[in-house]
Design a protein with these regions (language model features):
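A general structural signal marking secondary-structure boundaries and capping sites
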Residues: 36-39, 43, 153, 157
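Short glycine/proline-enriched turns and hinge-like loops at secondary-structure junctions
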Residues: 122-124, 141-144
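Active-site activation/catalytic loop segments of kinase-like enzymes and analogous catalytic loops
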Residues: 143-173
Length: 173
């Protein structure tokens, strides 16, 4: 079987890889906020988990511990302070997951890739038009999308930047 996916072309829209102004970053938040708002009443549990355990922090933490034990690249000693920082926060690692499981946080439709280049902006006004790249949409916590957007927005380099010294966290946006 062959499957095709098609989209409507959004005239007079632009897609930015990095924000050129603080307003660009703000408009990405408007786009994803609108996405969340429009899907507030959608039964998120009906969605398929397209990337299993993507935001399951306890599962990621277990994988970290296993990798640290093996240290396959023999680099753990070089980042010991960072490792200790992560290990010291084990008690908090499952907070969101536990709250979702207990029903203390609502299960929502989440995008899970809330980067600026997943929001089309009007070419003239630069206002958010729509959210795109919906292949990662699945059930989760809206905190996932918020955290991912902050991760992207505060970064000083592209997420696939090879030179790690270019990557910092900017608090100016």
């Amino acid at each position: 079987d062959a499957y095709w996916r098609t989209y409507d072309f959004v005239e007079d829209s632009i897609c930015l890889q990095l924000p050129e102004t603080d307003e660009d970053f703000y408009q990405s938040a408007v786009g994803f906020g609108t996405f969340q708002q429009l899907l507030t009443d959608f039964p998120a549990a009906k969605l398929h988990e397209t990337i299993p355990n993507f935001h399951n922090t306890p599962d990621r933490y277990r994988a970290l511990l296993e990798t640290l034990e093996r240290d396959p690249m023999h680099r753990a000693a070089q980042v010991q302070p960072e490792i200790e920082f992560a290990l010291a926060r084990q008690a908090e690692m499952a907070t969101i997951q536990n709250a979702l499981t207990a029903g203390e946080l609502p299960l929502r439709v989440t995008h899970n890739d809330t980067k600026l280049n997943n929001v089309l902006l009007d070419a003239k006004t630069r206002k958010a038009l729509c959210v795109i790249d919906l292949d990662t949409v699945m059930p989760g916590s809206s905190l996932y999308d918020f955290g991912d957007s902050i991760r992207f927005g505060a970064a000083t380099a592209a997420e696939d930047e090879k030179d790690i010294f270019k990557m910092e966290m900017s608090l100016d946006r």
